[in-house]
Design a protein with these regions (language model features):
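Nucleic-acid substrate recognition interfaces
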Residues: 1-172
Length: 172
């Protein structure tokens, strides 16, 4: 079931963010460097795929860099937070690198995203298969695609995708 597979992918993404963020928060509050962390990519590559794990790690690093920049400027800010928790529910989301997904729009719009081998095995996908999902709605802009962020809205029981694009100067 594609929905279950996507939910598992989003849950693993949130788990990666939370584990990495927990280690960085502990180091921060202990007065240590937040940049020396375990290699979480290796722990999650089988479920998320290498590029997706890398994107989540990069987004977490960027969140910490923003925190330190604001902190340095004297802003009253808190360290990056968690994407929910296992008991009360995680904020289910993931980030797909711009060269790792394809979006086709038209009469039957769809997006194809990579998943790790463990999820492929669990859900019966072939080695080269990707998760193919129907897309509703149409992009407001077209241009060079950025990374794709997918979030699950539990209240509406729907998935939302956010895709930044770079629009050429001549069309702005």
């Amino acid at each position: 079931d594609d929905k279950r597979l996507l939910l598992d992918l989003l849950d693993a993404s949130a788990s990666l963010w939370n584990e990495l963020n927990y280690e960085r928060r502990q180091q921060f509050f202990d007065g240590e460097s937040v940049w020396d962390t375990a290699d979480y990519r290796k722990q999650y590559v089988d479920v998320l795929g290498s590029a997706t794990a890398q994107q989540i790690i990069r987004k977490n690093k960027s969140a910490w860099q923003s925190f330190f920049a604001a902190h340095k400027n004297g802003e009253d800010t808190a360290p990056p937070g968690y994407w929910g928790n296992e008991d009360e529910g995680r904020e289910l989301r993931t980030i797909i690198r711009n060269d790792q997904y394809t979006l086709e729009t038209g009469e039957r719009s769809r997006v194809e995203i990579p998943v790790g081998h463990a999820l492929k095995d669990e859900y019966g996908l072939g080695y080269h298969d990707r998760l193919r999902l129907e897309v509703c709605g149409a992009p407001k802009w077209d241009g060079e695609q950025g990374r794709l962020e997918i979030q699950y809205d539990e209240i509406d029981d729907t998935f939302r995708a956010f895709q930044p694009v770079t629009v050429p100067d001549s069309r702005q």
